[in-house]
């Protein structure tokens, strides 16, 4: 009897010895957590897949290098809890050459990224997904996702769109606030709070070329021409000689005139819920415009 009890306790101890770092719960419709039969079952109900794409790049001293990627994936997960759609993250890094002066940033070439995006979408199309929604959380990727979406539309049986295109428009402020600023920090505080260190936040001094600095008020005011030419020149690799790499314009990597100590989880919650609700409305509207085809007609023979 004692031997049996000892064996039972030893077996229970072995079962309890699992990875102490793993705290993730299984998320509905999140591809990395699913089995293939679960994906097959989802395909009978939906032909839609969100592909979050973003970056691995510096985000100042207060928010993590994975801010863009985590923001995109977490928002996509929230969307998938409200409407039947698969979430399929495919790659963490993006196009970030202008951040390379900050340690930890990873950048991938245009050609490599567009091939990975397109070929990953092709795999999902092969399985029967016919509506591809790119959720891009990094401005540097925007022209790539536009190109790949158009290529999917031109070369495959699927239809691809950029999910954020019809729901952009963060609240306009009277002060310049972009990369790693109050808006992004607030979003991080809501979506992944344990990775934000607000004690390292503060007021940032921008060191833009004089003509770009003079254009800032027009950019903040929403002038279309000023914004277009400003962004065409700003945030470019140091090697271009434009003096607009992130490090050349900001010693901390924060591209904002606001004090990031103003960031709050409540601001992040409001912005996130607004985006998620708009995305869900977009998806539900698309479902009414294009009925779901039978799975047998969608899967490769």
Question: Language model features by range: what are they?
Answer:
Residues 8-16:
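Hydrophobic h-region of N-terminal signal peptides that target proteins for export
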Residues 17-85, 89-97, 103-108, 115-131, ...:
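Extended, histidine- and acidic-residue-enriched regions that form the cofactor-binding/catalytic faces
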Residues 1-8:
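Sec-dependent signal peptide recognition
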């Amino acid at each position: 009897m004692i031997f049996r009890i000892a064996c039972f306790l030893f077996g229970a101890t072995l079962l309890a010895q699992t990875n102490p770092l793993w705290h993730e719960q299984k998320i509905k419709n999140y591809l990395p957590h699913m089995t293939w039969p679960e994906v097959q079952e989802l395909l009978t109900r939906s032909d839609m897949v969100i592909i979050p794409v973003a970056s691995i790049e510096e985000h100042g001293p207060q928010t993590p290098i994975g801010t863009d990627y985590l923001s995109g994936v977490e928002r996509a997960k929230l969307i998938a809890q409200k409407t039947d759609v698969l979430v399929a993250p495919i790659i963490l890094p993006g196009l970030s050459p202008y951040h390379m002066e900050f340690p930890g940033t990873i950048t991938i070439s245009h050609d490599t990224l567009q091939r990975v995006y397109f070929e990953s979408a092709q795999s999902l199309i092969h399985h029967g997904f016919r509506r591809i929604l790119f959720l891009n959380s990094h401005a540097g990727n925007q022209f790539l996702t536009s190109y790949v979406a158009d290529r999917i539309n031109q070369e495959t049986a699927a239809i691809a769109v950029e999910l954020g295109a019809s729901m952009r428009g963060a609240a306009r402020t009277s002060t310049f606030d972009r990369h790693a600023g109050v808006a992004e920090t607030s979003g991080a505080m809501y979506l992944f709070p344990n990775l934000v260190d607000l004690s390292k936040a503060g007021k940032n001094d921008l060191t833009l070329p004089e003509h770009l600095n003079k254009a800032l008020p027009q950019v903040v005011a929403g002038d279309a021409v000023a914004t277009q030419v400003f962004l065409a020149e700003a945030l470019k690799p140091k090697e271009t000689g434009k003096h607009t790499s992130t490090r050349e314009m900001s010693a901390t990597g924060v591209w904002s005139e606001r004090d990031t100590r103003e960031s709050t989880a409540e601001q992040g919650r409001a912005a996130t819920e607004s985006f998620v609700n708009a995305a869900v409305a977009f998806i539900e509207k698309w479902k009414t415009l294009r009925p779901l085809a039978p799975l047998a007609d969608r899967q490769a023979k």
